[in-house]
Amino acid sequence: PISVAVVGLGRSGYDIHIRRLRGDERFRIAAVTDLIGARSKEVQKEFGCQVFPDVDALLKGADAEAVIVATYSDTHAPISIQALKSGRAAICEKPIADSVADAKKMLSTAEKTGQKLLIHHNYRFFPETRHLLDVVQSKRIGEVFEIRMRALGFGRRYDWQTLRKFHGGVLNNTCPHFLDIGLRLLGSPVKEVFCDLRQIASFGDVEDHVKVLLRADNARVY
């Protein structure tokens, strides 16, 4: 099995990644680290894995071939780059980075080290997403001129995803799911972008309401 280290044991690291790996014979959870040490100890009890106090120690001593980066959004790029330079594949939670420059640095590091880099856009693997892409790309319903996607919910959150210093906000942490699918459905480079950001209900200092309009070269609108 492929040995995996997990950095960050919050909702994504534990509830999504470890839950999916649990019971899959193709993978072995080899090492973990989290800012809250008690979380690491809980995972160690279940899987008998190595526990490290921080990322640096994990990358120096973990018996792992791949590293899952499920940390605050502002740390995705530096930790992924560290993992790649340590000679391991990196599976990074979305968003990839906080800037195009950092994203390009991640890609160039993967190329230079010969290691694999995967950004975890899990929605693209859902059966309904794959079916939707097939229907649009095959033109079975004719030429698509407009695509609409909507996600609704209400919550008065006050955690790291509502704070700018951690690169929180709906645009960074929720919209990547829909932008990833939308860009593939558009099937052409984006020519125009309109974006309206508002903070309506959540605490913190970032947006919790986003309206995005994309217009592609092929005249499709998303």
Give, region by region, the residue ranges found by the protein language model.
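Short loop/edge segments at beta-strand edges and connector loops
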Residues: 53, 92, 119-121, 194-197
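Rossmann-fold dehydrogenase core element
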Residues: 105-122, 142-147
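N-terminal Rossmann-like dinucleotide-binding module
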Residues: 1-47
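Short, Asp-centered acidic motifs that coordinate Mg2+ and/or phosphate
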Residues: 31, 65-66, 146, 221
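Active-site beta-strand termini and strand-to-loop segments that position acidic
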Residues: 212-219
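Predominantly a Rossmann-like dinucleotide-binding segment in NAD(P)-dependent oxidoreductases
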Residues: 12, 123-203
